[in-house]
Design a protein with these regions (language model features):
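Alpha/beta catalytic cores of nucleotide-metabolism and tRNA/nucleoside-modifying enzymes
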Residues: 2-36, 40, 46, 164, ...
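Glycine-rich, positively charged N-terminal anion/phosphate-binding segment
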Residues: 20-30, 45-122
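N-terminal small/glycine-rich loop or linker at the start of catalytic domains
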Residues: 32-41, 78-99, 134-144, 167-179
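Active-site mouth loops of central-metabolism enzymes
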Residues: 39-49, 99-112, 149, 175-188
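Hydrophobic faces of well-ordered beta-strands that scaffold small-molecule active sites
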Residues: 40-44, 70-72, 100-104, 128, ...
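Alpha/beta enzyme core
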Residues: 59-65, 113-144, 148, 152-232
Length: 405
């Protein structure tokens, strides 16, 4: 995708300064035995970061001469160990993925350790990330996700189990977490300390609490505080909508890199911009609608290649609104695109889009994906907050549970 070069920083002075400073901000990112040229990680997102989407983002990054880390959808340790078919079906990798990266979720150290062993031994995974950031009630009510770091001892046991299992294969383990449960129950500094003591290669921090969900603004100051608190690399996450945001986060916080989630929805070319930005080039890809429809075709094509045409087209439907955000495509056409069942049908509908329509620059920097409102409370196991050292009442995760944080 060529797109049109654009100084993405025109929205405000901070963005403009970040884009205009044409300096190399990073020499890449090293996580144990894994190294990438661009210090950027694609966050695992349920139903999004399958092999097809990871391949699409990888193509964009490499087109700009960069390499990033693209993480598979989150899977559960119990599902993997017990041979759950849905879990196993998610562990599909594209032929171009030199570094196989998977996010693992679990609340039982034994299961997490065994699942890590399976990933390394049976699937050739080169990087394992552990999820301690998911804020959704179905996870936190079991003591998992963003709730688990409150139990410091349990967190340490899980991390050590994964690091020990992965260490036999020289595979680095990282963790992703949030600031805490709510402002009164913060966990991220202790989590960073425990991660470092456990031999974790890096910690990614989403600058929101569980009670915030995806609402409000991410607190980048918390990322800076964590950077000062630990000696292992810290990756910043939250409110990275443009490449300029990533540069600004690294500059303001001292983070070793960034984790990008919702910002790339319907915009896989963001990884091209990120590769350029961290190499010192002030560019932003502004594709015409014709170029966007080419990207949409490529995305659907990859989905069909990995899943078959019927399922691939169904999986593509959710992406239509993200790709067309801000463009003038009519509601009837959008609706039809969101119901496609074959590639031929998709191509016929894409042909109806006006190819010369310019990119809607008004949406640059705007949030994408789910946002919502803060939760009234975080659902936790009974008595969860009574102590920080005991296990409390951890409820075992469902074998086929999938979500993200």
């Amino acid at each position: 995708m060529e797109g049109r070069p654009h100084p993405a920083g025109r929205r405000d002075d901070a963005h403009q300064e970040a884009q205009e400073e044409e300096v190399v901000l990073s020499a890449g990112l090293t996580l144990g035995s894994v190294r990438v040229d661009t210090p950027v990680v694609l966050a695992p997102m349920a139903g999004i970061t399958n092999a097809a989407y990871r391949r699409l983002c990888l193509e964009q990054a490499t087109a700009q001469g960069g390499t990033s880390l693209f993480v598979c959808e989150m899977i559960t340790s119990r599902g993997l160990v017990e041979g759950d078919a849905t879990t196993r079906s998610m562990l599909v990798f594209d032929e171009l993925e030199d570094v196989r990266s998977v996010q693992l979720y679990g609340t039982d150290p034994a299961y997490v350790g065994k699942a890590t062993e399976i990933l390394c031994a049976d699937y050739g995974v080169a990087h394992v990330d552990l999820n301690f950031g998911c804020p959704v009630p179905k996870v936190t009510r079991k003591g998992g996700g963003a709730a688990l770091p409150w139990k410091r001892s349990l967190l340490g046991e899980i991390l050590q189990a994964a690091v020990t299992a992965a260490g036999r294969y020289d595979v680095p383990v990282t963790m992703k977490t949030r600031m805490g449960i709510d402002p009164e129950h913060l966990t991220y500094l202790d989590a960073g300390r425990i991660a470092e003591e456990s031999g974790v290669a890096a910690i990614a921090l989403h600058g929101r609490t569980a009670i915030q969900g995806y609402s409000g603004a991410a607190d980048w100051d918390s990322i800076a505080r964590l950077v000062e608190h630990v000696s292992i690399p810290v990756l910043g996450n939250g409110d990275i909508w443009e490449a300029a945001d990533a540069l600004r986060m690294v500059e303001q916080t001292g983070a070793a890199g960034v984790v990008v989630g919702r910002g790339c929805l319907g915009r896989p070319w963001l990884f091209r911009d990120l590769a350029a930005a961290f190499a010192g080039s002030a560019i932003a890809t502004l594709p015409t609608l014709g170029e966007v429809r080419t990207m949409m075709h490529r995305h659907a094509e990859l989905l069909c290649r990995h899943m078959g045409e019927e399922r691939g087209c169904k999986e593509f439907r959710k992406h239509v609104s993200w790709y067309l955000k801000g463009f003038a495509a009519g509601g009837e056409l959008r609706n039809s695109l969101a119901l496609v069942s074959t590639m031929a049908e998709l191509d016929a509908l894409l042909a109806e889009l006006e190819p010369d329509e310019p990119f809607p620059t008004s949406i640059l920097g705007a949030p994408r994906g789910r946002q919502g409102s803060p939760r009234k409370r975080v659902v936790l196991p009974e008595g969860w907050l009574e102590d920080t050292d005991g296990r409390g009442v951890v409820v075992r995760e469902d074998a086929n549970e999938t979500t993200g944080g």
